[in-house]
Amino acid sequence: MAKPTRKRRVKKNIESGIAHIHATFNNTIVMITDVHGNALAWSSAGALGFKGSRKSTPFAAQMAAEAAAKSAQEHGLKTVEVTVKGPGSGRESAIRALAAAGLEVTSIRDVTPVPHNGARPPKRRRV
């Protein structure tokens, strides 16, 4: 049988891009794209090995943002616009981690979808 060949990652030279931070109550996903929306790098708290309730911590979001930034910098990325979506606890720490990783943050946009009284929300938790 033929040996499976691994697809070689092509190095793109892209100066600026968009960092999409999706912060839910259970996880934080950081995806870095070029200005047209084509993915360069992504990472999440779960993909880094955090399990269960540890995925939803600000530290896990920070680690996910650092991993995505490091991977995107290999493509020559220097500046990012940040879009944040969701109510999760990892919003602020992910933005700080992107800046600390050496990416210049030019703007921060909150694109959390707000319903115009759509579907009924889940019932209140009683702890």
From Swiss-Prot:
GO biological process, one term: translation
Superkingdom field: Bacteria
The keyword Transport belongs to this UniProt entry's keyword annotation: no
GO CC terms: ribonucleoprotein complex; ribosome
GO MF term set: rRNA binding; structural constituent of ribosome
InterPro entries, per the entry: Ribosomal_uS11, Ribosomal_uS11_bac-type, Ribosomal_uS11_CS, Ribosomal_uS11_sf
Disulfide bonds: none
Keyword DNA damage listed: no
Alphabetical UniProt keywords: Ribonucleoprotein, Ribosomal protein, RNA-binding, rRNA-binding
A Pfam family of this chain: Ribosomal_S11
Role played: Located on the platform of the 30S subunit, it bridges several disparate RNA helices of the 16S rRNA. Forms part of the Shine-Dalgarno cleft in the 70S ribosome.
Recorded family membership: Belongs to the universal ribosomal protein uS11 family.
Subunit architecture: Part of the 30S ribosomal subunit. Interacts with proteins S7 and S18. Binds to IF-3.
Protein name per UniProt: Small ribosomal subunit protein uS11
Organism, scientific name: Streptococcus mutans serotype c (strain ATCC 700610 / UA159)
